[in-house]
């Protein structure tokens, strides 16, 4: 039995792929053998044949666990992050997806790296979220939160959006485009990157605004202070207009409504092994070329 600074650990996974399920099983028995109390999220528990296991939802894990381990791809992490960010819990991910910017542990070496993490050797990163509210009938209604991005878009590919952007009550521009991405630094390697936005280091205290196919050459991505409050207004709505956040169901927006996006009071307490380096991760995940010294070896 090995000592651990984490007494209770949650296991979270949504994939039914045999390799992912195998990781759930190996991880559960490994943690259990160390005398750690393990809470398995319902989806993962339904795929395991574990007798007398403690099973709960994301809020149960957030309330009672010290650490949550998410197994899967970045989508699985996003799915869990919005709930876990509302609790005082650290989160780490084992990659069973594709890129794995958020779930960065290699499943083949995860137990070795987790041994160091359980001993207290890890890097801590606090990733902020964005809160989305809509002003509807003179009332502010909270829609949800996003760890990656908030996306304004239409329901059909042929229609453009006309909207006005305000930052801290100051008019910035009006635009006709296919939409707008409002991204955190965490989300700058996701949809915002595909739309031509820059990559922001996760510790940068900023919000990224990236137009989607704007109908003007002068419209460029903009980086603003994370303390700014963003407002979207719509002078004309000719098709179904929606606001989406991460992988959650988009919400329909009407002409008379205004959308507000600001930095959330909650954050995702993400941890990494001590050998983690963000730019090395970018190099590997995005296929950047090697440096000159390495190519001469």
Swiss-Prot record:
Pfam families xref list: NAD_kinase (PF01513), NAD_kinase_C (PF20143)
A GO biological process held by the record: NAD metabolic process
EC number, as in UniProt: 2.7.1.23
Record key words, sorted: ATP-binding, Cytoplasm, Kinase, NAD, NADP, Nucleotide-binding, Transferase
GO cellular component, one term: cytoplasm
Known cofactor(s): a divalent metal cation
Subcellular location: Cytoplasm
InterPro entries according to UniProt: ATP-NAD_kinase_N (IPR017438), ATP-NAD_kinase_PpnK-typ_C (IPR017437), cNMP-bd_dom (IPR000595), NAD/diacylglycerol_kinase_sf (IPR016064), NADK (IPR002504)
Ligand binding (NAD(+)): 74-75, 79, 148-149, 176, 178, 189-194, 248
Name of the top EC class for this enzyme: transferase
Alphabetized GO MF terms: ATP binding; metal ion binding; NAD binding; NAD+ kinase activity
Catalysis: reaction(s): NAD(+) + ATP = ADP + NADP(+) + H(+)
Residues at the catalytic site: 74 (proton acceptor)
Function text: Involved in the regulation of the intracellular balance of NAD and NADP, and is a key enzyme in the biosynthesis of NADP. Catalyzes specifically the phosphorylation on 2'-hydroxyl of the adenosine moiety of NAD to yield NADP.
Matching PANTHER family: NAD KINASE (PTHR20275:SF0)
UniProt record similarity statement: Belongs to the NAD kinase family.
Protein name per its UniProtKB record: NAD kinase
